[in-house]
């Protein structure tokens, strides 16, 4: 909030321009990271492991570990099905988050309103994540994940009708309502599906899926926006990812989510 204020109201901080506000924002973030990293460096002791790390052929061994983990995952059908669904819908979700500013800019909204909209998303997202967790306990993890994806589908459809900054703020608020909740519920569902003795390697693969997923979405949005010469066509095209994602989810055995 302070950094955003430095950009929007530079004169209040005795700065000459918004550009200077951006520069000092980066500096303040660096100082923030340094100060709050000090306790980590001083008081957190690293555990010692007996296993020695072999640095010969690191890339080959990394790919081999990923391949071996994938072979293990294939033995657990519910896990594999969920990861396929997750790849689809998380790609679309991350695309919306990452390209929101570019989308707003293409629609002609000024940068100040876009930044405020992003902050608005974060303010809503923090309490909404806790509320989402409560609702997931009450109505079920699977049900709330489906609800979250349906809201994202509505966001894509609603984006076709944006005509003002108010509409963009509504979209930002909707994203804030479900962004953290969908991610946390997804991780919880995955943790319920996997064997606990393999949690480390399976979650490593889960994170790899999440990081590598943001490839198709941006390319799809850019391609469709270019073909139709309209950024709205790009956002609505994300339904190509959301719909398979939500449909594949229904093939995950619900009984697998129940822990003994």
Question: Which residues does each PLM region occupy?
Answer:
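Juxtamembrane intracellular "pre-TM" segments in multi-pass secondary transporters
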Residues: 45-82
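Short amphipathic helix-loop junctions that connect adjacent transmembrane helices
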Residues: 98-114
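Structural signature of the two symmetry-related core transmembrane helices
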Residues: 143-158
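A membrane-interface helix-boundary motif in multi-pass transporters
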Residues: 4-31, 223-242
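Helix-loop junctions at membrane interfaces in 12-TM secondary transporters
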Residues: 160-172
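Intracellular juxtamembrane helix-capping segments at the cytosolic ends
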Residues: 181-194
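Helix-to-loop junctions at the C-terminal end of transmembrane segments
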Residues: 127-141, 225
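Multi-pass alpha-helical transporter architecture, strongest
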Residues: 32-43, 236-260
């Amino acid at each position: 909030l302070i950094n955003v204020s430095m950009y929007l109201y530079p004169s209040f901080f005795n700065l000459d321009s918004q550009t200077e506000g951006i520069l000092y924002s980066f500096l303040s973030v660096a100082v923030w990271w340094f100060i709050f990293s000090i306790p980590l460096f001083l008081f957190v002791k690293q555990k010692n492991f007996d296993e020695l790390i072999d640095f010969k052929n690191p890339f080959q061994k990394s790919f081999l570990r990923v391949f071996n983990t994938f072979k293990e995952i294939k033995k657990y059908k519910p896990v594999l099905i969920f990861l396929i669904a997750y790849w689809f819908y998380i790609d679309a979700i991350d695309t919306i988050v990452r390209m929101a500013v570019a989308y707003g800019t293409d629609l002609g909204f000024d940068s100040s309103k876009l930044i405020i909209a992003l902050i608005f998303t974060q303010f809503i997202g923090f309490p909404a994540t806790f509320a989402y967790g409560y609702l997931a306990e009450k109505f079920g993890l699977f049900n709330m994940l489906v609800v979250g994806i349906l809201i994202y589908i509505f966001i894509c459809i609603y984006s076709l009708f944006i005509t003002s900054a108010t509409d963009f703020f509504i979209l930002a608020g909707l994203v804030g309502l479900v962004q953290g909740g969908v991610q946390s519920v997804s991780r919880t569902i995955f943790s319920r599906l996997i064997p606990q003795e393999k949690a480390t390697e399976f979650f490593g693969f889960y994170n790899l899926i999440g990081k590598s997923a943001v490839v198709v979405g941006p390319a799809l949005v850019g391609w469709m926006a270019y073909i139709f010469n309209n950024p709205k066509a790009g956002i609505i095209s994300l339904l190509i990812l959301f719909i398979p994602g939500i449909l594949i989810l229904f093939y995950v055995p619900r009984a697998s989510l129940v822990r003994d």
